[in-house]
Amino acid sequence: MKYNMWFMFIVAVLIVSQITGADPGPLVLFYNSPAVYQSDVTSNEALPIGNGKLAAMVYGGMSEEIIQFNEDTVWAGHPHDYAHAGAAGYLQQIRDYVWAGQGRAAWNAAANTFMSVPLRQCPYQPTAELRLAFNHSGTTNYRRQLDLTTATASVRYTTGGVTYSRDYFASYPDNVIVVRLTAGQAGKISFTCSLTTPHTVVSNSVSGNDVVLRGAVDHVGRNGLASDIEFETRVRILCEGGSISSSGQSLVVSQADAVTLVLGAASNFVNYNDISGDPGSLCLQTVADAAAKGFPALRQAQLNDYQALFNRVTLDLGTSDKTNNPTNERLDAIEAGVDAAKNDWSLFNADDLQLVALNFQMARYLLISGSRPGSQPLGLQGKWNNELEPSWEGKMTLNINEEMNYWAAEVTNLAECHQPLLDLTRDLSETGAVVANVHYDADGWMVHHNTDLWRGAAPINNAGGLWPTGAAWLCMHLWWHYEYGGDVNYLEEVYPLMKGAAEFFADTLVQDPRPGSAGYLLTNPTHSPEQPNPALGDDGEIVAGTTMDSQLIRGLFTYVMKAGEILDVDADFRQQLQQMRAQLPPNQIGRYGQLQEWLEDVDVPNTHRHLSHLVDLMPAGNITPHHTPEMAAAAEVVLNWKGDDTNNTAWSQAWKMCCRTRLLQGNHAYMILNKILAKSHTDNMTFSRKGNENQIDGNLGVLMGTAEMFLQSHQGEVYLLPALPDKMVAGSVTGLRARGGFTVGITWQNNALSTATIYSSRGSTCRIRSAWPIVVAEGTKSVALQSPGENLYEFTTQAGHIYTVTAYSCPIPIPYDLDNDCQVNFTDFVVLASEWIDNGGGEGVDLADLAQLALDWLECRRDPAGTCWQ
């Protein structure tokens, strides 16, 4: 076989050159001018940094730098029980109105007797601003950037023949924000440093090399609750060369070679019912400890911590010279392309796949920067807020937005960043137990559609807040964390929370008493978020038994039953839940072929932003094209009604994108993604918005929608490339997680799977769904596969082992009659071709011809129809 090794080498080189992705491009946002500062407005241009507890916006000014920052427990209000005493005494009256179809009477009764006290919750607050006055002018070569690989914002410019540089990062290990100032010449760094706040200044002074500001929140939100949060922020200046002097409440740095600023902040918040903390001593100790380490050690600790999370996942969709353009111009180009295409998506030609990858990693960056163990969970604006009255108070909205913030935490390998939401759920199980008792005379716990720093759980704003299934949705996340990680000790810890949520519904679900009804167990009163039942007119806001509620409760009962079985506890309660689950209304298909939003078939086509009755499609994963095709088709009818326009909010568009990926409609999801990039992203890619209403949930929802183009794992399957858009011809992703304890990397070429690697952390059975035939190996050893169904491949794994998945050819006839059977895979092809050459076959066919033939074969194996061979 004298040609065998050469032939295999040539083919291997050619194939690898095709499969290997190009340079994924720089994961950097950059701009050629500073961000514009406005007081009491959260910037859509400044660059965000954060460590979970501290969050800052960097504006990059030359004459004056402003770093607006938040400490995530600085809110209006004080510890407060929002429950409405005596509310349970009116519950039956409200229910009776609903059963009688008198929803307006139910609304009025609830408004007077059942709502939160006060009616609104408290707003998240800005903390302070670090101001550095340079008085630089006449600058050139300006560049402002955010490097996602190092979590570092930077500013560079030249003035007076000197190039100045500033780098900014937030350290989770040291809980400080660090600013590093350098210059191209020694002795050129001079500035004045001060701290300001929009709140009451208790004291503002200089202490040694520190500027210290003590403040008290004085803003009273629209609910009228007095604000009792106090805080301290302190910046320490570490000079290399030059001098430091004081000037009133500021410090002046003169002619330094380099400077490090260490900024900390703390409040008197201990937990939602304790504000006895000492912010002064805590802030002083934090800043002193960090400053003592010095800049190199601070930097290394920050990088080690951040990159251990960020580097877990890579996404390579290729790159182009578009990466040479400022980020805002790239977004503008996509917007121009979307506008030019109008309603004919085939005309869209402004693809920027590297920007798609950048957007994906930007969302992961925001999740890391805004949500870490020990911090508060992300709210509607994440952690970055410069407004005393942010939109919707910057709270945690539980009927879609808060959960969307965390949909992608597990799949994008940031399970630690999920922890603040899980901690919030634990807090709400306590305040929600009070509301369950006071409002519903029920055991267990529940929460309505919003909460704040003080963990309010009662219904707020108006009677439309009577949405009782917040706990059920939050418990979905408790269960997901177990599904991905498999830690039984964790499951033991959270099982009481899940059980408590189920106990509430076991106490409060009521059998439909209306004549002619099917006697289902229903929630009453309830509300489908922002949507009245169209058949009831003014009586349609407060109803019984929405589809969303039934989906969430059915899911909750299922999680609790599974968890109880794993832990071998509460057999009788599991039996009760099983019986009650069978009495919940099923998903129903209506007269238009739509998935019904209501118990009755009364849906009217509409474009409203909420997709509440599609929870079973996304995020729950109980509706899928393969397992429930009729319901999947019914969900698609609803999505087609809703449309893809961005006149709704970005979170709604992100939800639609996620739904399309769940329906395996990658091209449609990609279209929505580009519309979001065009119309709903701000220049800094930080907030998705409607008008000036800044929100972060759209960013994080798109993160989930993008990840699930490449990998989905509900229904017990590791689904490879389930919704790959046609425009993503070649690429790779590494580090995504699948349920069952798997970490997955995938490479594709010509829109088809090439290879995948699967790391098994738990030794679970792995069931793969793949549109392409596959073989699996561990090292050089083939792994036996079972086929439990079409396009399904199942094999056993061992904990700590890595498995390689390789897609092979669709059965095709091999030219030159190499084999009588003519049905071979690639390995067979190489061996047979080599033997054929050795035996003198193929007169007039040389080695190069066969190498090209192998590449042709490679093309064909990614074409399931085999049309290239016809």
Where are these regions (language model features)?
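Extracytoplasmic low-complexity repetitive segments enriched in small/polar residues
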Residues: 741-744, 748-756, 766, 774-776, ...
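Boundary/junction segments of secreted and surface-exposed precursor proteins
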Residues: 19-33, 812-823, 870
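Extended, hydrophobic alpha-helical segments in both membrane/secreted and soluble proteins
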Residues: 401, 470-481, 490-507, 652, ...
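Aromatic-residue-lined binding/catalytic grooves and analogous aromatic/hydrophobic interfacial grooves
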Residues: 22-463, 480-482, 490, 499, ...
